[in-house]
């Protein structure tokens, strides 16, 4: 890396290592500011009449993140400044005073506050679409990991798998105003009665959950999809693991070309055994993984058996329970899942928090997976210094940001770093990328981040911890965040929350081919025993990884 990188951040052509993943991020562009960089501090350019323009924030930014590595799943990689006004990104480019510098895109006024982004990486806040919010503390774990949008399906230690009655949803929403994340709730979709589904949608559910524990049958899947088409929300599907009422072929037939989000498509989290993975590769079936199987590791098979038994009310002393639990745990489909992610066939990652997944690990498991499959690439040893991993990095970034936003109809608000989007931004030090964020901005305001000893003379004195910032306190969370609802509910009245509400949009027309850096169509084959998986006839395999990136060096 150039000598310029230490004080001012990298320039075009520099390569940045992402933690211990082995992934190489190459800077493809930098704003034209060499020798005239905007800096703040003693004897720096951020002074009135030099780098600061004497103007009100009607002409300048409320907040600027300067000289940061901007990582957007659509626009790619560049070094620039991010301007924020009234909680939204107002521009990305060169920051400064146009009276004293050329080519300024973002005016830094004498009222503008500044976050020094030199050497940091900025990404959109993560979007976790599969959260069993059995404890309110799950939201702390989410934002601590860089997630700023959560779609949940419970509200406390109650068996639910999708919230049903208006009274329960109302209580949940009133409580969730306190959390500094965007929130949506999935209504109970496992019903053959459209009226019971309509009740949860009118109570401001943002989608529907069909689950085998409450019935994933021909009737429930079809009814949920018909209601989703009526209201324009997404259906999250956990298929029939016992194959009692439907096989995987039957489920595909019932879906009938309609858009649907297939949760934990590998199957360990639930679904048709042993071949639910055959749902991947269809243009209308939008697929995701939950994080415990990512990447496929040495102890994954043994770990999952205990989780399945506990989460689904099974008895380890009952042979039939152990038998059906073991049928869900297949090394071959776990290995193939990792490969299908790299091919762009599986489109999203999520946590399945407290329902067999970990709320705070989706970012790091997504990029640990990227590092593992990159290392397994047979051509990697032949790479030259000019090679980089930008395309792979951006593909995996899309899995946790823009693609879930598209699938759940909120991409008009979040999922990207681009003008007009809500300024939900995670800032990372490169050595901790995807493991622990340095600072999380919610609606353009610091809500969570690294903080030091509060009695120290400087703010970075050890011990350093990830904790709430001012944007997570008082009335700020509801001011900086939104509720994900649906148009039909909002037309009937406001939600019982102080925060603003947005309606899902475009959920029913989404296809895999619309997703960013994904959408490969083809045929996944799974043998009758679940021990061989193919993609368009080619066998998919991967050895279980013994050492997972972004783990021991970063957490223990």
Where are these regions (language model features)?
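Active-site microenvironment of metallo-dependent hydrolases
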Residues: 1-103, 143-149, 225, 330-347, ...
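Divalent-metal coordination cores built from histidine and acidic residues
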Residues: 1-54, 110-122, 139-233, 257, ...
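Residue-level marker for buried hydrophobic side chains located in beta-strands
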Residues: 64, 113, 125-127, 235, ...
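Di-metal (Zn2+ and/or Mg2+/Mn2+) metal-binding site signature of metallo-dependent hydrolases
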Residues: 120-141, 534-535
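Active-site neighborhood of phospho(di)ester-bond hydrolases with catalytic His/Asp-centered motifs
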Residues: 123-130, 151-154, 186, 262-266, ...
């Amino acid at each position: 890396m150039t000598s310029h990188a230490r004080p001012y951040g990298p320039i075009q052509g520099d390569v940045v290592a992402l933690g211990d993943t082995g992934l190489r991020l190459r800077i493809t562009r930098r704003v034209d500011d060499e020798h005239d960089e905007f800096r703040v501090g003693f004897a720096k350019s951020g002074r009135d009449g030099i780098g600061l323009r004497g103007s009100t924030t009607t002409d300048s930014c409320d907040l600027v993140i300067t000289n940061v590595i901007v990582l957007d799943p659509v626009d790619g990689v560049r070094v620039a400044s991010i301007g924020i006004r009234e909680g939204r990104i107002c521009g990305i480019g060169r920051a400064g005073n146009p009276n004293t510098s050329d080519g300024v895109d973002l005016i830094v006024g004498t009222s503008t506050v500044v976050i020094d982004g030199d050497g940091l990486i900025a990404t959109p806040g993560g979007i976790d679409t599969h959260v069993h919010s059995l404890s309110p503390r799950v939201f702390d774990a989410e934002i601590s990991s860089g997630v700023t949008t959560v779609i949940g399906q419970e509200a406390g230690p109650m068996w639910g798998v999708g919230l049903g009655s208006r009274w329960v949803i109302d209580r949940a929403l009133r409580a969730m105003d306190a959390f500094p994340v965007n929130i949506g709730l999935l209504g109970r979709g496992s019903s053959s009665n459209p009226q019971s589904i309509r009740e949860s949608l009118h109570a401001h559910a943002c989608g529907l959950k069909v689950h085998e524990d409450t019935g994933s049958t021909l009737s429930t899947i079809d009814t949920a999809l018909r209601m989703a088409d009526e209201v324009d929300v997404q259906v999250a599907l956990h298929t029939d693991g016992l194959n009692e009422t439907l096989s995987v072929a039957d489920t595909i037939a019932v879906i009938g070309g309609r858009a649907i989000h297939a949760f934990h498509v590998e199957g360990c989290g639930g679904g048709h055994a042993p071949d639910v993975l055959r749902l991947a590769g269809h243009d209308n079936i939008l697929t995701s993984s939950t994080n415990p199987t990512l990447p496929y590791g040495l102890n994954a098979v043994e770990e999952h058996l205990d989780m399945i038994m506990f989460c689904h009310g099974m008895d380890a002393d009952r042979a039939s329970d152990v038998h059906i639990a073991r049928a869900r745990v297949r090394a071959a489909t776990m290995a193939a899942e990792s490969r299908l992610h790299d091919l762009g066939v599986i489109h999203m990652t999520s946590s399945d928090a407290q329902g067999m997944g970990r709320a705070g690990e989706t970012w790091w498991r997504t990029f640990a997976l990227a590092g593992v499959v990159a290392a397994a690439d047979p051509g990697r040893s032949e790479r030259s210094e000019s090679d980089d991993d930008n395309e792979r990095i951006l593909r995996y970034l899309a899995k946790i940001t823009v693609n879930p936003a598209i699938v759940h109809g909120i991409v008009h608000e979040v999922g990207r770093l681009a003008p007009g989007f809500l300024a939900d931004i995670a800032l990372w030090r490169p050595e901790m990328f995807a493991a622990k964020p340095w600072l999380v901005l919610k609606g353009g305001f610091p809500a969570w981040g690294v903080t030091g000893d509060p009695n120290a003379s400087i703010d970075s004195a050890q011990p350093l911890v990830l904790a709430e910032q001012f944007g997570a306190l008082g009335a700020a969370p509801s001011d900086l965040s939104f509720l994900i609802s649906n148009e039909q509910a909002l037309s009937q009245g406001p939600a019982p929350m102080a925060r603003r509400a947005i309606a899902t949009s475009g959920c029913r027309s989404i296809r895999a081919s619309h997703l960013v850096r994904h959408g490969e169509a083809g045929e996944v084959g799974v043998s009758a025993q679940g021990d061989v998986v193919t993609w368009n006839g080619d066998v998919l395999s991967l050895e279980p990884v013994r050492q997972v990136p972004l783990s021991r060096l970063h957490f223990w």
